Structures are given as C-alpha cells and as structure tokens.
C-alpha cells in the first residue's frame, strides 16, 4: 500500500478505534495523545450500544468487554421528592474501556500510540501530498492524512478553520472558533459500587431544570448531576473546587436509590465539573485533514450517544480510507481527488444520523430536566408506560441501530444474532 500513513490526533476511545481499524487494514499510523497516559483513571462512565459492541468485537475484544462491562438491565426513575416513576436502558467505566482497547492492540501497534504529544500546528503540504503535525515538544510527524479525534476543544478543528481563513474563505462559511453551545452543566463523580447496589442498575432523579443520573458497573458506579445554566454560552469554563462543592450541596439530598442519597456516595477526589456542549460543525474536512467524534459533533450525555456516534464515524471513515488505498494499488497512494472523495462519502453516510441523534439527545436532556410544562407532562406521564417504551425501542431505536455499518474489510464472527437482522452483516471468516 505504498507509504500511506495516517496521523491520528487524540488517543481516546475514538482514536483507539481508528488505530485498531487501520492496523487491521495494514495501513501505517501514529496516534498523538496530549496526556501523559493513554488511560486516565479519572474518566467518567460510558454506555456502549449494540452496534458499538459489534464493531469492537471485530477487533477480537468481545470477551474482555463482556467481562468488564455490566449490562444496564434495570432502570429506576424518581422525582427529587423520592417518588418511583419506573422507566428503561446498557455500562463501562471509561478508563477500563480505554485500557481494554489499548491493551487489545498488538505490541507493534501499541508502540505507535505516543503520549505527551500536544499538537500545536497542522500544515498541509500540497507539493508533496502530505500533512505535517507539530507538537509542543518540538517533534514533527508527517503523513498522508490526519484524523482529528481530539475532543470538544479540538486543536485539529482549530487548525482546519485557520487554514480555511488563510485560503480566503468567508467567515460565514467557516465554523465559529467555539462552535458548540452550552445550555447545561454537569457534576460527576465515580465511587466503588456499594454492596447494596446491584451491577447493571441505572437510575434518574428528575427535577425542574435539573437531573441526577446513576450508572452502575461491575466494580464502580457513576453519578452525573445536570443543571441548566442561567443563560447559554459558548465560552470554555474551568470550574473550581468551590463551584463543585456548591453544586454538590444543591443535590446532596436527592435520592440515588430507595435507601441512598447523593451525599452518601459522593467522593470529591473522583469528581469533576464541566459545561455540556451541543452542536455539529459545518466543516468536517479540508484537503488531507478530517474530523471525527467530539471534534465535529457534541451531544449532551443523557442518551449516551456521543461515543457511539464517534465509533460510527470511525467505521465509515476507515472503510472509505481502506477502499481508497486498496484502489490506488500497492505501489501508489490515493490522489488528493481520491482523498476528497473518501472524506465526502464519509460525511454523506453520517450527517443525517448525526443530526437526528443531536435532536434526540437534546430532547431527552430537556425531558429529564422538565425544561417546560410540556416536557414535564411527557416525562412524568406520557412516556412512562411500559408499552410506550416498547414502541419507542421497537419502532425508533431498533430500526436505526440495525442499519449501523461495520468494518467491511475485517472478517469476524457475528456476535449478536436476534429476531431482527442487521442490514450490514460482518464479513465472515474464510475457512481454510
């Protein structure tokens, strides 16, 4: 496949999925992670949906993932006064998920995941059809394309925007410097799972403009408190310990289960606080640089759609990259035209669902926080009956999930077979 090489900016879950995918395709890569360690012990919990589990199973990680995760099999809903609503959802401690994904890479591929690499500039070299990424430690990396998987405050996205401005593109076409709006903020903390709380339990405690959510894994649990801001903002906010303490006190007596309040389990040592970003960028690529996951779209976490969408981004993009490289042949590389076509095809596959899930996440956040009288009535009464939830699952969630793509070039056993068939079957292994 010639000397085609991909530079992945960001070593989080989406970046590691890209590393696995490119390794499986036989395409050279390097991952540049700004933190000192790939596995950050302070990470929050995440929920993987069946399409995401199916994709990670293509990497041979199914057994490790099933051992570490807890299926979300029981969900309870409360009001902040403690009344049981009864409602339904599936859990991972993020550091454990990242560890499994990182250690699941072969040793030679793990050696390409570099830490303490804070990206400063990304320069596209039109004369040589390459892109050069520079880091704050003075190191530089040159590749055929760069993939930005570096989060909500993406340096890759900033560099893409600056390149468009340098090329004379009007600001109305360019993304805002801060493209995501924040209407809510969150306080989260993780803690060892108490014996009184079974693995796989999820819960939500609803109030006016506020929600408390519980996710319980096998060894640890996570609580996230959501609160509406006094007014929306696009500014990045760094919250202090005092801010966290004040928000904690305002939620301290909210019920987590029938017998536990938030103050019973809160641990400030494993807590964090941040604004919740929402939005989708206008520009996903330019030249030889392309964005995936949080660098190009952000959802509130209530519906658990952020990482799951990021994984789908990587699947669609890497399928196109692999096809372009294969078409170019072993002695050549894809032309700029071929790269552009691959990036455009990726976006065409993903944009409609991105927008749909953005709307769905925003709606769920506002339902759970009783953002209006209508949201309150829907959350407390109209959406509570089991038959309504079954209809939502069977006629909204399942038809969407069954259409999720997989890596076309990775052969594996189909891990999930049910009454509803997947639209895109996994390539079967060839028996020799």
UniProtKB/Swiss-Prot annotation:
Family per record: Belongs to the paxM FAD-dependent monooxygenase family.
Pathway note: Antibiotic biosynthesis
Binding site residues for FAD: 33, 47, 94, 294
Domain of life: Eukaryota
Molecular-function GO terms, alphabetical: FAD binding; monooxygenase activity
Catalytic activity, EC: 1.-.-.-
Organism of derivation: Sordaria araneosa
GO BP terms, alphabetized: antibiotic biosynthetic process
Record keywords, A-Z: Antibiotic biosynthesis, FAD, Flavoprotein, Glycoprotein, Oxidoreductase, Signal
Recorded name of the encoding gene: sdnN
Cofactor(s) listed: FAD
Glycan-carrying positions: 283
A Pfam family hit: FAD_binding_3
Protein known as: FAD-dependent monooxygenase sdnN
UniProt KW Oxidoreductase keyword: yes
């Amino acid at each position: 496949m010639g000397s085609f090489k991909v530079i992945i900016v960001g070593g989080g879950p989406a970046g590691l999925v890209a590393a696995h995918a490119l390794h499986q395709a036989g395409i050279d890569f390097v991952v540049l992670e700004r933190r000192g360690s790939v596995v950050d012990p302070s990470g929050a919990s995440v929920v993987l949906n069946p399409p995401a589990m199916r994709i990670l199973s293509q990497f041979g990680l199914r057994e490790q993932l099933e051992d570490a995760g807890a299926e979300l099999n029981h969900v309870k809903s409360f009001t902040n006064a403690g009344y049981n609503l009864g409602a339904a959802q599936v859990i991972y401690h993020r550091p454990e998920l990242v560890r499994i994904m990182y250690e699941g890479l072969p040793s030679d591929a793990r050696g390409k995941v570099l830490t303490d690499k804070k990206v400063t500039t990304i320069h596209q070299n039109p004369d040589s059809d390459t892109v050069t990424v520079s880091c704050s430690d003075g190191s530089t990396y040159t590749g055929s394309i760069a993939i930005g998987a570096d989060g909500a405050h993406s340096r890759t996205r900033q560099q893409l925007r600056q390149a468009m401005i340098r090329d004379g593109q009007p600001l109305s076409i360019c993304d805002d410097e801060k493209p995501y709006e924040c209407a809510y903020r969150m306080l989260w903390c993780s803690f060892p799972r108490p014996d009184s709380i079974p693995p796989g339990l999820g819960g939500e405690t609803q109030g006016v403009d506020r929600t408390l959510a519980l996710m319980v894994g096998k060894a640890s649990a996570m609580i996230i408190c959501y609160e509406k801001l006094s007014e929306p903002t696009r500014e990045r906010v760094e919250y202090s310990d005092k801010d966290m303490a004040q928000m904690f006190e305002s939620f301290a007596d909210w019920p987590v289960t029938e017998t536990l309040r938030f103050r019973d389990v809160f641990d400030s040592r494993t807590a964090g606080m941040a604004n919740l970003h929402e939005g989708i960028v206008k520009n996903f690529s330019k030249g030889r640089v392309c964005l995936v996951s949080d660098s190009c779209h952000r959802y509130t976490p209530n519906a658990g759609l952020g990482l799951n969408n990021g994984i789908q981004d990587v699947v669609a993009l890497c399928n196109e990259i692999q096809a372009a490289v294969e078409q170019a042949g072993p002695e050549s590389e894809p032309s700029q035209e071929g790269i552009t076509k691959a990036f455009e095809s990726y976006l065409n596959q993903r944009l409609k669902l991105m927008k749909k899930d953005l709307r769905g996440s925003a709606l769920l956040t506002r339902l759970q926080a009783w953002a209006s009288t209508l949201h309150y009535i829907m959350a407390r009464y109209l959406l509570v009956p089991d038959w309504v939830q079954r209809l939502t699952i069977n006629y909204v969630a399942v038809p969407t999930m069954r259409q999720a793509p997989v890596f076309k070039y990775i052969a594996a056993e189909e891990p999930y077979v049910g009454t509803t068939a997947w639209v895109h079957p996994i390539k079967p292994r060839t028996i020799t």
